[in-house]
């Protein structure tokens, strides 16, 4: 009887050890997608970011060097719009301008997690949830009134991640993106007040606010040295 109890305890310990080991596995990459809302700030909307909200869809691919850092590639397709009739400011001769466009964006972001993000391995103080900050560089393309445009953008923002399970992640992210162009809202609004735009001055902004879900894959080499 005692021997049977010992065998049962040993088997139970082995199963638990295997389960814990599985929960502690690390993965190098993350892939997923999301949907969200967009906003615009420019000549056709100078104050209220979501005066005419649009929508976007997103694909993402993330490299995970360690629990604190992530390097993410994003591809967006979405809509933007603005209407100067809703503004308190007026243009010369009382003109009003309205636009809508579909945009495409490819960007690269560096993310910093405030906590060591992950499941298991208590000695590394992994947290199932973590806020983060992000910054990077991207390129945006659009068409307004049949005229094509493209420009670099600088995305800056914040987000949060939550581990649904060992491999599945739920995320939320808000990014403001400064474009190096004043024609995101159309060539007609490039210089409505006669103030010439430059590479840094009088340029348009837009935002993306997304909910994402992603899946981790490609196990990290167990024999390799891992840097936190």
Question: What are these model-derived regions, one by one?
Answer:
Residues 22-62, 208-221:
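Short glycine/proline- and aromatic-enriched beta-strand/turn motifs that initiate or cap beta-hairpins
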Residues 27, 51-55, 102-106, 129, ...:
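Residues that define the transmembrane beta-barrel architecture of outer-membrane proteins
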Residues 26, 64-68, 115-117, 163-165, ...:
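Outer-membrane beta-barrel channels and translocator barrels
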Residues 85, 165-228:
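Predominantly the C-terminal beta-signal and adjacent terminal strand-loop region
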Residues 67-145, 211:
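Gram-negative (and chloroplast) outer-membrane scaffold detector with strong preference
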Residues 33-37, 57-63, 108-112, 135-139, ...:
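Residues on the lipid-exposed face of transmembrane beta-strands in outer-membrane beta-barrel proteins
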Residues 43-48, 84-90, 121-124, 145-150, ...:
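Outer-membrane beta-barrel translocator domains and adjoining extracellular loop/strand segments
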